[in-house]
Amino acid sequence: TGTERVILLRGKDMKILVVNCGSSSLKFQFIDSEKEEVLAKGVCERIGIDGTLTYAKEGHAKETVDKDMPTHTEAIRYVLDALMDSSKGVIKSLSEVDAVGHRVVHGGEKFTSSVLIDDAVIDYIKECSDLAPLHNPANLIGIEACKKIMPDVPMVAVFDTAFHQTMPKKAYMYGIPLEYYDKYLIRRYGFHGTSHSYVSKKAAELIGKPYEESRLIVCHLGGGASVSAISNGRCIDTSMGLTPLE
């Protein structure tokens, strides 16, 4: 099973396919975990319309080709074909894909860290779709597509919201009737958590401070922007709220 395979692979040099699935796109990187190197990366765009695959092996120029990809399942197949290509690929067979990591935007209150994906996790991600209707359904499409093609490969969900679940109640509760939280889980969740986690740990390392003793303000600046406050290695506040748009 996937769980047993994860246990067997611990301590092994793992090759991991990382997937960030949107409604009509699929970004990916293929990573050697021991060397901390990106072996290949790319993006499938316009899935379901006029699909294209952009692919680049590390150290080589990227190439974009038109591909017929009615669904994300075909997109994943093209990605795997590119990774196994005799001239541009980086692996010889699917057996070299040790795990798949999926970016999932909203994990609600339940997930405080990355988790191995099983049916219960998938069901809860679906439950959280009302909180992230543009993101979670697309993330689930990517998970289902990978499960269909690689049913025995362990898959992990990495949540944007997980890092911020250490916030105290005074930081995540709104000044609204409590029943809105009790019934609809309306509260501050925070996003860009994977970025905030990495940057805060890297900053502590660079200034020579133990992460558990760090006090930091972390900024994520990209397609979106957010700020978080870190105290003793734990997020205590963040600028984004119920949704990434707040």
What is the meaning of each model-derived region?
Residues 125-136, 153, 182-193:
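Flexible, glycine/proline-enriched loop segments at strand-loop-helix junctions
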Residues 25-69:
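Short glycine-rich, Thr/Ser-proximal phosphate-binding strand/loop in the N-terminal lobe
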